[in-house]
Amino acid sequence: MNSRIIKTSCTAIALLVGVGILWLAYTTFQSRYLRPFDNQATLFDGSQLRLPAELAGPGPIRVVHFWDPACPCNVGNQQHLADLVSHFAGDGVSFHVLQKPGSRGQLPANLSALKPLASLPGSEHLPASPAVAIWDRQGHLAYFGPYSEGAVCNASNSFIEPILKALIDNRQVTASNTLAVGCYCPWAG
């Protein structure tokens, strides 16, 4: 009789400990990775962005990824960015990255092809990240804004593929001011 009570008690305690561990894991995940979707519109104004002197002027199509390592919104666009690099790097497109000043972090290995920039004139006025700026072959800003609109970023809802395809086909694109709703983190401060 005593051993039966001990077995039942041990099973109940193990079950409670297991439920407690699952609850702790769930709440930790939720507080760290899940957050309410902020449907506030963000205006991306590229009027003050300039390429650094060493990249300015005629050359390849240049894509600059604005990256804040602490922003949880990066998770959604990093695989998409890696796909862009693998698809368009051979088509005369160079990929660069500007890390948020004062932040610390390292890009994932699949984004090691992005060339780091120390600074980019006008980037101190960025409203949010992740964001992207694309300059055409003549060195004119063709696009500035988010990768996509909405809570998730992927090729099916991306603004970037059509713009890069148009620029590769030598069609003019002018979209340096964009209003979008999505997962973004403040860049300034």
Show which residues each predicted segment covers.
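Intrinsically disordered, low-complexity terminal tails/loops enriched in metal-binding residues
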Residues: 37-55, 83-88, 185
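N-terminal targeting signals for export/organelle localization
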Residues: 1-47
